[in-house]
Amino acid sequence: MVVTLSKVDLNLTAIKSLIPVRDKDAYKNLFGHVLIIGGNHAMGGATQMATMATVNSGAGLTTIATDSANLPAIHTVLPEAMIMDWTDVSAIQQMIEKVEVLLVGPGFGMDNLDLWQLIKTTIASSKHSLRIILDADALNLLAADLAEEDKTIQELLSPDNQHEIILTPHQGEWRRLSAGKVPADDQASIQNWVDQAGAILILKGSSTEIYVPNELVIYRNPGGNPGMATGGMGDTLAGMIAGLAGQLNKTVDAVKLGVFLHSYIGDQLYEDHYVVLPSQISKRIPYTMKEISKKEL
């Protein structure tokens, strides 16, 4: 059967309606608790950038599980976040059971296999539903597990999975995830892969595309610019989506809002900057959300 997919461009009018309105009596527990696991001793900055984006996107609470070498720097740069040593197995298991949103991958590294196994098994046995974003090294570890037909991963990446999973690959990561069998320009085959995996796919590129399980619509983001071609942009996007996922009723709305805001802010900065830094984007998130919410469209 030939599947016909329609394309919808993300735009300011549609995005404005997704920005959550905060009641006067709102408190932090209403806006989600995010756990970010990442940042080995060499790549602590990736986790810092993801966390900065999560905090500035409005997450009620943010906890980082990272290499102990990163703790002093994170305490200094991100006093809003809580921190834990990722070698504390019991604490990580308890935190996964406690939070609403889990982001794994920024700066995680490919050799941290024991922690990856712990995360997989804890998620699989979790008693509550999570919104899970897998980014960067987590995608490469996921691809390796799929190639080896890892049973836990096969159960997690299925339509029957209780969790809502978001995958954020760029072109190279997508080749590994799909084992090179699904070209990035074969949209019908990508949609079929997404339907079977039961996961939302953000296929990053010059025009980022969002695929949703069992939907016949591809959401396309036309924004972005060459000034954003710098390390940490993906970490920042993943952090933004994590922060928004705890605030919105629909996970796909958090994805659309995060993807749009990321490039929208980047395009604004690019008007006056040759290079757009991820930290610049994060700092402008609260201002831009307020600005858009007040616009007359």
Label the model's feature ranges.
Residues V2-L12, T63-G223, K290-L297:
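Glycine-rich phosphate/dinucleotide-binding loop and adjoining beta-alpha-beta core of small-molecule
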Residues Y264-L297:
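Charged C-terminal helix
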Residues A42-S57, T63, N112-D114, L139-L142, ...:
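Short glycine/serine/threonine-rich phosphate/pyrophosphate-binding segments
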Residues N29-I36, E215-G227:
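Glycine/charged-rich beta-loop-alpha catalytic/anionic-binding loops adjacent to active sites
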Residues M1-K28:
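Positively charged, low-complexity intrinsically disordered leader regions
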Residues D23-D88:
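Substrate-binding N-lobe of the ribokinase-like
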